[in-house]
Amino acid sequence: MLDPSIDSLMNKLDSKYTLVTVSARRAREMQIKKDQMIEHTISHKYVGKALEEIDAGLLSFEKEDRE
């Protein structure tokens, strides 16, 4: 079973596509800057760590209005 679960992650963001985009961008940022918001993570991989940050409510996403 995956932790965090997809159900708990979907409560934080509006779609699976947004979830993938936000977690991939954050994972790339962690690789470059070597920083993470959670001290002790379950996952050893960057994407897993990013998903844990999203589940903890440490990352958010705002849609930009394009007019």
Swiss-Prot record:
It holds the Pfam family RNA_pol_Rpb6. It catalyses: RNA(n) + a ribonucleoside 5'-triphosphate = RNA(n+1) + diphosphate. GO terms for cellular component: cytosolic DNA-directed RNA polymerase complex. The keyword Endoplasmic reticulum does not apply. Belongs to the RNA polymerase subunit omega family. One of its GO terms (molecular function) is DNA binding. It comes from Bacillus subtilis (strain 168). Keywords: DNA-directed RNA polymerase, Nucleotidyltransferase, Transcription, Transferase. Promotes RNA polymerase assembly. Latches the N- and C-terminal regions of the beta' subunit thereby facilitating its interaction with the beta and alpha subunits. In vitro reconstitution experiments this subunit is dispensible. Gene3D superfamilies: 3.90.940.10. GO terms for biological process: DNA-templated transcription initiation. The keyword Cell inner membrane does not apply. Its EC number is 2.7.7.6. It is an enzyme of class 2 (transferase). This is DNA-directed RNA polymerase subunit omega. RNAP is composed of a core of 2 alpha, a beta and a beta' subunit. The core is associated with a delta subunit, and at least one of epsilon or omega. When a sigma factor is associated with the core the holoenzyme is formed, which can initiate transcription. SUPFAM superfamilies: RPB6/omega subunit-like.
